[in-house]
């Protein structure tokens, strides 16, 4: 009985809301943060991407569409990123362009903690979940049954390269 009550107690990390400070605008600096899904001192961070590629703010609270889930090294929106790429799961029809593949989402169906992120993508009737590790992240995509499913890997920048090798269940590449 005593052991189970220890696990039910909240830990300090449970009080962290990664969405705080994400209502960023050029006209008024309101935090300029992004909801990092990462371990302390992790090699990279992951975040949902609501902004267009190349924008300083990859995630801001106001938009209602997610364009992908971005791997980032960006410490602040005021400092440019490097080695970045985004992945976007989808169903129905493969869409490569970042505007056409974006999916509507609601903050009511979004859960953000430093150690777990989940969101329902209504355009594709599916859920994406992310859990960080020291060097990467685990993703779980819950696709609807009897639907074609895709995952787009977008390396963003010129000079980047992505190759899918289906027979080896492998994706290789690099970004600049």
What residues fall within each predicted segment?
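Bacterial Sec-dependent N-terminal signal peptides
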Residues: 1-10
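Accessory carbohydrate-recognition regions in carbohydrate-active enzymes
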Residues: 9-176
């Amino acid at each position: 009985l005593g052991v189970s009550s220890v696990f039910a107690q909240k830990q300090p990390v449970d009080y962290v809301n990664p969405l705080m400070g994400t209502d960023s605008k050029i006209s008024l600096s309101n935090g300029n943060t992004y909801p990092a899904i990462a371990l302390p001192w992790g090699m990279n961070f992951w975040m949902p991407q609501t902004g267009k590629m190349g924008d300083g703010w990859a995630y801001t609270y106001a938009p209602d569409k997610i364009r992908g889930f971005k791997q980032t090294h960006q410490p602040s929106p005021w400092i440019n990123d490097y080695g970045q790429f985004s992945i976007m799961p989808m169903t129905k029809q493969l869409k490569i362009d970042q505007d056409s593949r974006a999916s509507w989402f609601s903050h009511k169906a979004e859960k953000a903690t430093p150690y777990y992120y989940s969101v329902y993508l209504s355009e594709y009737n599916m859920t994406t979940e992310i859990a960080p590790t020291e060097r990467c992240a685990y993703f779980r995509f819950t696709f609807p049954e009897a639907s074609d499913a895709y995952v787009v890997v977008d390396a963003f920048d010129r000079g980047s390269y992505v190759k899918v090798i289906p027979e080896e269940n492998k994706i290789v590449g690099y970004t600049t």
